[in-house]
Amino acid sequence: MSNTESIIVSQTKTTSWRKSDTTWTLGLFGTAIGAGVLFFPIRAGFGGLIPILLMLVLAYPIAFYCHRALARLCLSGSNPSGNITETVEEHFGKTGGVVITFLYFFAICPLLWIYGVTITNTFMTFWENQLQMPALNRGFVALFLLLLMAFVIWFGKDLMVKVMSFLVFPFIASLILISLSLIPYWNSAVIDQVSMSDLSFTGHDGILVTVWLGISIMVFSFNFSPIVSSFVVSKREEYEGEFGKEFTEQKCSKIIGRASLLMVAVVMFFAFSCLFTLSPQNMAEAKAQNIPVLSYLANHFATMTGTKSTFATVLEYGASIIALVAIFKSFFGHYLGTLEGLNGLVLKFGYKGDKKKVSVGKLNTISMIFIMGSTWVVAYANPNILDLIEAMGAPIIASLLCLLPMFAIRKVPALAKFRGRTENLFVTAVGLLTILNIVYKLF
């Protein structure tokens, strides 16, 4: 083999798909698959078969183009080791850094409130329906669960991180297993209800409004934005010095594309399996009861008439336990991000950025009291979870995931080559439609 051929073979090996690329693909995929996925089938199936088919068409473009836009923003900084906050400060100054810190905090903190409501409702429905125990006081249940999680966080954060990381893929496997196991219980109710003469495209329950609201729940459920900055830094340090920024951008796009495909395949299969097992009316009941779809499935199998199979009995209990584990996992993961963001805000505005004025322990205590206290208040109030996602969680995520990168592409010279592309209009539309949910909820 000639020297030229040896060089070509060597370059092909080094620039081809690496083990680290597979690891990050699974990491992005695992970050997105959490408790939010348990509400997607409810919103997607609420309007019947046609809206969920339209959401199926939109799911991959939303997941891929939005996260790729955020990754490109992270890639635009001059420092390969700089995170998104540093990159935004580089482009827009200190004010931009403060804005991104606020956005990150307010994108994650409402998710904790959502998970606080969810875990309270999931535990209470499991206690009353599966264990057949008398109803408990809601405030007491919420306080007990939050204190339990606070205890674990305070005394075993490192162990918690390891356990939560370990639980990611068993949870994904459980979702796939449940989706497959529901196939024998599929029925044609959702198909039978499709009537072309009764179809309505406008109005409160029309297809367009259902899909519009579905976009916000997709932004929420198909979201691995919290890890994109770390992912880009890792890939830049691995590839940029040797192969350049353009190659690194292409590699990041491929990884995001594969992670998005995995995510959409698993979540949409789970959603369709739930919809064919239940019905749009069942999804409406789940929304009214303010519980995740796994808890509703557990109650559904608990009320089955006649002789139940062993599988139905196992699913009745297993679905609730899997839901509880998923919510615990998501709560812990988002708590760490919220704590970091709130610590930064308290330090910046309470102590003028001087780390010598306050200890890390005191910062953590102040932040924990605020986070757990506000989460308990919301959990006790029990607002509708889907309404909270659509009016608060998803719009803030969309502003960070969709609109911030699009604004940067228009204003930052380093991103000028991405201007004028069709996908930019799509990402902007997704962001604006998600934020407009706030207006819709008000009226």
Swiss-Prot record:
Keywords: Amino-acid transport, Cell inner membrane, Cell membrane, Membrane, Symport, Transmembrane, Transmembrane helix, Transport
GO terms under cellular component: plasma membrane
Membrane topology: Multi-pass membrane protein
Coiled-coil portions: none
InterPro entries membership: Amino_acid_transport_2 (IPR018227), Hydroxy_aa_transpt (IPR004694), Thr/Ser_transpt_TdcC (IPR023726)
GO molecular function, one term: threonine efflux transmembrane transporter activity
Location(s), subcellular: Cell inner membrane
Catalysed reactions, semicolon-separated: L-threonine(in) + H(+)(in) = L-threonine(out) + H(+)(out); L-serine(in) + H(+)(in) = L-serine(out) + H(+)(out)
Main location per the UniProt record: membrane
Role summary: Involved in the import of threonine and serine into the cell, with the concomitant import of a proton (symport system).
Family as reported in the entry's similarity comment: Belongs to the amino acid/polyamine transporter 2 family. SdaC/TdcC subfamily.
Protein name (Swiss-Prot/TrEMBL): Threonine/serine transporter TdcC
Originating organism: Enterobacter sp. (strain 638)
